[in-house]
Amino acid sequence: MCKVIAIANQKGGVAKTTTTINLGAGLVKSGKKVVLVDADPQGHLTMGLGFPKNLKVTLKSMMENIIMGLEFDPKEAILHHEEGVDLIPSNKLLAGMDMSLFTVEDREKVLKEYLELLKDEYDYILIDCMPSLGMLTLNALSAADSVLIPVQPQYYAADGLMELLKVVKGIHQRFNPDLQIEGILFTMDNCRYNNAKRNKQAIKTTYGSDIRIFEQTIPRTESLAETASEGVSIFDYDGKSKGADSYLELVQEVLKHA
């Protein structure tokens, strides 16, 4: 059975895309069939896997086919990466979809309808959400079985987390009663600083009794930052690094929770 996980946080710079790439590549290393969905008009996931920005067939194309009720090949947009993970790419043209969806009946279900056509092909579908709570993110959360929330252990992280959790609760109540929280993942973690330790503890104290918080944290490392320009995962770029080890541990936690 295919599991759809949205990686979401309306705050940028929390390693959503890095986590999508490396969780996906790690699941492939564990023998799973995985497709990544770039649901952000910035196209960072697409570029982070080494693909160009000017692709003609993208997530936008697939969603437009759904909206217009056309017959189409749902696999047409899928790109195959050398590490075995598949990708449904995006670029800046997807930004127009956020506005277009407001005029569509059942507008929150367009992405879900498309992904349903792919579920028989994959064990996991990971959606890299845009850093906002607009219509595309609503579509991603409506299509997902669970949401994984990357959080950088900073002072203001708790405010953004509270806002996102309210949105998730609303979507659970109105559109997607099956939506669960996969967990909160601390990213870009620098355990040497007491401030980061205090902020992590504050989030654990506030949310830990109701929401799963991953035991594994993702460190702030040079190698993880450098992978974005190399078009590969941390496993291909520096497989013996702390970053690679941390994402492999995260994969095991996700698999245990499946």
Region annotations inferred by a language model:
Residues 1-258:
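P-loop NTP-binding core
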